[in-house]
Amino acid sequence: MLNEIKKDAQDRMDKCVEATKTQMAKVRTGRAHPSLLDSIKVPYYGSLTPLKQVGNVSIEDSRTLAISVFDSTMIPAVEKAIMSSDLGLNPMSAGATIRVPLPALTEERRKDLIKVVRAEAENGRIAVRNVRRDANSDVKALEKEKECTEDDVHRSEDEVQKFTDAHIKLIDEILAAKEAELMEV
């Protein structure tokens, strides 16, 4: 039972790290990256559809994304969805392709984005700590039910703490890489 609790805690912590990584990928840096447009939804036959389902998003050069829309009648809707997003992008259509140039980030905007990234990292750390708390309370519940000894409880808590430290270190590394990427001019 203790091994199941530890395995579950580790799996949930891995998911927290992945979620943090995904959230940070949405933050725009100076470079073009297809995941930048993942959060954009386009109205398609009455329902909001993710952009990647109505077209291919590719990198044209370091500061430009190219979107090849499958249905050419969708081009105006895709452009409008990109413009109305909070990314501050201005798409231009060229035939069946939509080009999205990424403007250079100002120093002030970089600092704002670093604050956003740090907040996302802190949310990830909090999620990992919540998993630790849940795992430790599950272990203590087992002790109360006399299914494990006090030594087992302390050993399990130590292992869960090691998982927690490792996952928080991973989040800190992701944060450091993203901050370095944001500060590149």
From Swiss-Prot:
Record's keyword annotation contains Cell inner membrane: no
Name this protein carries in UniProt: Ribosome-recycling factor
CDD domains xrefs: RRF
A single BP term in Gene Ontology: cytoplasmic translational termination
InterPro entries per record: Ribosome_recyc_fac (IPR002661), Ribosome_recyc_fac_dom (IPR023584), RRF_sf (IPR036191)
An annotated Gene Ontology molecular function: ribosomal large subunit binding
This protein's record includes keyword Transferase: no
Known role: Responsible for the release of ribosomes from messenger RNA at the termination of protein biosynthesis. May increase the efficiency of translation by recycling ribosomes from one round of translation to another.
Keywords: Cytoplasm, Protein biosynthesis
Short name of one Pfam family: RRF
GO cellular component: cytosol
Coiled coil: none
Protein localization: Cytoplasm
Similarity annotation: Belongs to the RRF family.
Main location: cytoplasm
